[in-house]
A protein has these predicted regions:
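Membrane-helix boundary and inter-helical linker elements of multi-pass secondary transporters
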Residues: 36, 152-153, 180-181, 251
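Membrane-interface junctions at transmembrane-helix termini in multi-pass inner-membrane proteins
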Residues: 10, 137-162, 177, 186, ...
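Helix-loop junctions and terminal segments of transmembrane helices
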Residues: 61-77, 152-153, 211, 268-286
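Signature of the first transmembrane helix
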Residues: 7-73, 102-108, 132, 167, ...
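Interhelical loop/hinge segments that connect adjacent transmembrane helices in multipass membrane
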Residues: 1-9, 185-189, 201-243, 247, ...
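Primarily residues marking transmembrane-helix entry/exit sites
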Residues: 5-13, 47, 123-127, 220-228, ...
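Hydrophobic alpha-helical transmembrane segments
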Residues: 20, 127, 131, 161-209, ...
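Membrane-interface helix-capping segments at transmembrane helix termini in multi-pass transporters
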Residues: 7, 38-46, 78-88, 99-137, ...
Length: 286
């Protein structure tokens, strides 16, 4: 049992490190290509939209973290009945979260073009960028979110990391091709949306093949994830600390300033994440 856990932990470390190296390499290249091909306004728009969507993640209300913590015990002891009950409770909340997330994305798609001006980008294009950027998040909550939590609790973070790396590489190469062919920011985000929806489908397929014992009709154990209210307080403070700066720049300084700022912030964030991966207990817990 300990050797299996160590093997999973090592796999998480190796795949996590490789993912970070790929992310750093392509994360530097792609924004530069967007800047040279579409301009700083387009790059700033993408950064601003991502920050808005980060705030929508608060709709989860800490359910994800609370559910994963609740799953560690039953997964370790092999109590499938308890796992199914926790998963059923998580699904109930995630389904509601997905509905409100989708509604919020639609509202943002309608409002964001009215509050942000981008030179060379029409309001309808801004709306589509918001829609294509946010749709995968809604689908994630509706169909995949609870499945990812079980993989993490089961020490199989490397599965998600490998899939995330492949998805990121495909998305990045597709962006390079689309930019070379002269497509705009809307087409880039439409492609991003399509690739991420395929990723969600792959996770669902993986879970169907390897976790056939999951019972969607199990009696929900809401008490097991009752600590979500305590978790959300920490998530709010972290989100405000990490994401407020870009939104303030968006509304008061314009998208061109956002583009410059996020380039430096991105590099700092990559280095911070890379260092954090070595000290994080996630590699041991999965």
């Amino acid at each position: 049992m300990n050797s299996l856990k160590a093997k999973k932990g090592l796999g998480n470390i190796v795949t996590g490190l490789f993912n970070q190296l790929v992310t750093i390499a392509l994360g530097i290249l792609i924004p530069r290509l967007i800047l040279t091909s579409l301009g700083s306004e387009a790059n700033g728009l993408l950064s601003s939209v991502n920050q808005v969507l980060a705030y929508l993640a608060l709709l989860e209300a800490g359910i994800g973290t609370a559910s994963m913590q609740a799953l560690y015990g039953p997964v370790a002891t092999g109590d499938r009945n308890a796992v199914n009950r926790i998963m059923a409770a998580t699904h109930h909340f995630y389904r509601r979260t997905g509905f409100f997330y989708l509604l919020a994305v639609l509202v943002c798609a309608a409002v964001f073009p009215l509050t942000v001006r981008a030179e060379g980008i029409a309001p309808w294009q801004i709306a589509l960028v918001v829609l294509f950027s946010g749709l995968p998040g809604a689908v994630n909550y509706l169909f995949q979110g609870k499945l990812r939590l079980l993989l993490l609790a089961d020490g199989k973070k490397y599965v998600l990391t490998n899939l995330g790396t492949v998805t990121f590489v495909i998305t990045s190469l597709s962006k390079i091709l689309l930019l070379h062919l002269g497509f705009g920011v809307v087409e880039l985000q439409a492609m991003y949306c399509a690739v991420n929806l395929l990723q969600i489908g792959f996770v669902c397929l993986y879970m169907y093949r390897h976790y056939r014992w999951l019972d969607a009709k199990a009696q929900p154990d809401y008490a097991a994830i009752s600590q979500s209210r305590n978790v959300v307080i920490h998530e709010v403070s972290t989100l405000i600390f990490n994401n407020t700066d870009t939104l303030i720049l968006t509304w008061f300084c314009g998208l061109a300033s956002v583009s410059v700022y996020t380039m430096y912030a991105m590099l700092f964030g990559m280095v911070t994440t890379l260092i954090g991966n070595f000290s994080s207990a996630n590699f041991i817990l999965g």
